[in-house]
């Protein structure tokens, strides 16, 4: 019987913590003890949801030039990686969880070294990519599956066949109760960690008379979940998968405006599948066009939160190996 679960989320961007939170809350709702940590931009959101966390070294990849990247790697990335691996190993040894959930390579290494069962969480599969990004992800998956119990992928198409060793579940959303203190509005802009041109998008939409809010702007009040904001909007423009998940589970139309290669690959697949209430834009003009099509429309996405299915998959897998 699984009584104690540890979750370690990656520390780059808030999205990794965002998808860990619904999994942690679902385990906790079933009476399972949850220990969680990761650090970085998502740490405060985990705190807001009532979880205590260890103090872990964060790891960043930086450098605008080859020399800057090399200097950062030698003097920051490598030392930080060593410290994080050591800290996560010590923490897991102390916590003694029955199973670990993680998207952190150092946590996976630590779990393998400590002989702790673990599942890797992801939102990408090799079929999304061509010859550049597909092979490295395939190798990473193969190596992961030599040590992990499996890979669980949070997906906008959870019923599609999954690669061997992989289980698909629905989008993992920071779901909560809609809030009466947030008035309905037209457009929510969520630039994430890598978005660009969102200032221009807001200006152009407001010029056309739309009521627009931007995540993190001056009048933004951070809440434990995104549901009050995504549910109050007519449409959301965002970049990363965790923001997409928060939007579609709330039943709000979503315009995916990708920047990173992984974001673009996922957005292109979503566009090709003609998902209800979900569209892609790669230019500011196209964003404006898609927003105007969605505002006031009665065509909305219909997704259940994938957290219950995620936890079911973990518990079933652990029971099978017990």
Predicted regions and their residues:
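Conserved nucleotide-sugar phosphate-binding/catalytic loop shared by glycosyltransferases and other
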Residues: 3, 11-14, 29-79
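Leloir-type glycosyltransferase catalytic cores
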Residues: 150, 157-160, 274-322
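Donor nucleotide-activated moiety binding/catalytic core segment of transferases
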Residues: 215-249, 255, 260-262
